[in-house]
Amino acid sequence: MRYHIMESRDIRMNLATEEYLMDHADIEEPLLLLYIQEPCVIIGRNQNAYEEINLRYLREHGITLTRRISGGGAVYDDLGNMSFSFVTKKNQTAFGDYQGVTQPILHALHRMGATDAQAGGRNDLYLDGKKFSGNAMYTKHGRTYSHGTLMYHVDLSVLDQLLTVSEEKISSKATRSVRKNVTNIRPYLDEKWQGLTTEEFRDQLLCELYQVESLTAIADKRLALTVEDRQLIQALFDEKYANNQWIYGETPAFDIERRTRIPNVGIVDVKIATKAGIIEGIHFFGDFFGALPIDELEQAMIGLPFVYENVEVFLEKHAIEEYILHFTKQACLDLLFD
């Protein structure tokens, strides 16, 4: 396994670097990326920024907003968080196998004293029943990356102000507080590691992953960027991750809205614009995952009569599960027409 530590503290630059390396790096052996960023919110590929984030709070506090190319929900990072990403050949990682992908991280944390760290839910890691890591995957061109957060000593007080909790995620016994359901890793580590900075925590975790005493022992495993790499990453930053059209998207006027939450799928929110019974625009939002880009399905549905039987025939030819993981044809029909 090779690794690359990102120097930038801008999440938009780090995501641009991640996507660039996924597309262009030599991955004959897996590649591990590590990055830390200034306060920011990253929404999932399929989410609606206006519904997920307190945008006023974000603006007032100078917090960066961007969108990633993978699915899943919104996350808040600051300098107390360390993000990681494994880039592999597609046949080396089963899409949605978060337990398998995160095992090396969990084993490293166990060696540092957080012995109760474990995988749970669809895509999360937990300590003492509280989430400290959310993960997401993306696949294209025979390659897959799985990336996640590691909340080392994040300012948890910000979460309630910034992230919106949907009604579908709130049960009668649940709490509206995001903060009460998450935790930081630092208090669970052996005492000798609890005074580390985020950068020192990153370096020690890397040593534990390789089971070496210091980074000098794995210096030959470190991937360095060329001048050309940096120029192409900057272009991706400008064209995509710092581009408001990518971040906020285009939101046309919709006349039909449906919303559901399904176990092991997540929230699926569909908005449909029709004219004379024909679909003129359709958009699926949510914290779901998918192996294929949802916009490909949306484009294919434009011009389709918004009639149960017509949509049923369409879905027989287009596997909805490829776009929304574990979402069945019948579940889609029920959402659209019930």
Question: What residue ranges belong to the model's regions?
Answer:
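N-terminal lobe of the biotin/lipoate ligase/transferase fold
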Residues: M1-G96
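FAD-binding core of FAD-dependent oxidoreductases
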Residues: R68-S83, L125-L127, K131, A136-T144
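Contiguous, small/hydrophobic- and glycine-enriched helical/loop subdomains that border
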Residues: N81-R122
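A generic structural motif
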Residues: T88-A94, P187-G195, G286-G290
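Long, positively charged amphipathic alpha-helical accessory segments at protein N-termini or as interdomain linkers
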Residues: M112, H141-Y248, L292-D338
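Beta-rich nucleic-acid/ligand-interaction surfaces
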Residues: A119-G134, A224-F237
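Short beta-strand elements
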Residues: A136-M137, L150, T260, V268-G286
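Structured beta-strand/loop patches that form or line metal/cofactor-binding pockets in enzymes
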Residues: E228-K275
